[in-house]
Curated annotation (Swiss-Prot):
Keywords: Amidation, Antibiotic, Antimicrobial, Immunity, Innate immunity, Pyrrolidone carboxylic acid, Repeat, Secreted, Signal
GO cellular component: extracellular region
Keyword Repeat: yes
Entry's family note: Belongs to the attacin/sarcotoxin-2 family.
Lineage per the UniProt record: Eukaryota, Metazoa, Ecdysozoa, Arthropoda, Hexapoda
Function field: Sarcotoxin II is an antibacterial protein which plays a role in the inflammatory response of this insect. The main effect of sarcotoxin II on E.coli may be the inhibition of cell wall synthesis, including septum formation.
Protein name in the entry: Sarcotoxin II-3
Length: 294
């Protein structure tokens, strides 16, 4: 019954998008914006937390500060929960251009500090295909503890117009090593509707000797007006199967397209295994605003 209610809620979010109408402004003399103007983007989101309270995050980013060849990246962010606890604060700086990019992020919550380094490369293979590679490393320092957790990730993806494939590896030093392979395909696409399908397999090796596999698939539908639905099924070897469903919608978008309000809802349920019938639900709102300058 609850799964039906969740699905109905997702459908309701999509239906709400029909209430948002955009009325184009008619200016006697259209004035184009400056070439490649800087933009400050503000993002704010609120989401339910299964452990209680609401997770709140804010981010302020400045992009388009460079030229058509090189773009600096700069942002600050904060995350916390309405029930209290330590607030995570951080900042990211980087640069991207000519298909290459690099950034560093430092964050902390008063108990632990993390420093993340990331680099990526995008190689165009003709008009409709790209080969994308990413590597990152996150070092964490916890106050009063000598052990310093380290998470390393690397991925290689081939993305075409209708098909895609990727392989990635995530190493959590002293904890686990995960290798994931995935394939995606565009099933249907026109001016308004898009339907994608994907399958994946993850081999998880943990240092405590408990190893398992995750295999699954997902269908993802999206509409040009900014709403969509997705559903997936994941099998954990030796544990059980878990179903997921979600939906999102753009509730409001300003006439100039610079401000938008989005909502999302989702949930999961274990279908078998020791966690059978255990459910998790979530709901969130996201507000974003881009302030043009120049």
């Amino acid at each position: 019954m609850k799964s039906f209610v969740l699905f109905a809620a997702c459908m309701a979010i999509v239906a709400l998008s029909s209430l948002a109408h955009a009325y184009p402004q008619k200016l006697p003399v259209p004035i184009p914006p400056p070439t490649n103007p800087p933009v400050a983007a503000f993002h704010n989101s609120v989401a339910t937390n299964s452990k209680g309270g609401q997770d709140v995050s804010v981010k302020l980013a400045a992009t388009n500060l460079g030229n058509k060849h090189v773009q600096p990246i700069a942002e600050v962010f904060a995350e916390g929960n309405t029930k209290g606890g330590n607030v995570i604060r951080g900042a990211t700086v980087g640069v991207q251009g000519h298909g290459l990019g690099a950034s560093v992020t430092k964050s902390g919550n008063g108990i632990a500090e993390s420093f993340r380094k990331q680099a990526e490369a995008n190689l165009r293979l003709g008009d409709s295909a790209s080969l994308i590679g990413k590597v990152s490393q996150t070092d964490t320092k916890i106050k009063g503890i000598d052990f310093k957790p380290q998470l390393s990730s690397s991925s290689l993806a081939l993305q075409g117009d209708r098909l895609g494939a990727s392989i990635s590896r995530d190493v959590n030093r002293g904890v686990s090593d995960t290798l994931t392979k995935s394939i995606s395909a565009n099933v249907f696409r026109n001016d308004n509707h898009n339907l994608d399908a994907s399958v994946f397999r993850s081999d998880v090796r943990q240092n405590n000797g408990f190893n398992f596999q995750k295999t699954g698939g997902m269908l993802d539908y999206s509409h040009a007006n900014g709403h969509g639905l997705n559903a997936g099924l994941t099998r954990f070897s030796g544990i059980g199967n878990q179903a997921n469903v979600g939906g999102y919608s753009t509730l409001f978008r300003s006439n100039d397209g610079l401000t938008s309000l989005k909502a999302n809802a989702g949930g999961s349920q274990w279908l078998s295994g020791p966690f059978a019938n255990q459910r998790d639900y979530s709901f969130g709102l996201g507000l974003s605003h881009n302030a043009w300058r120049g």
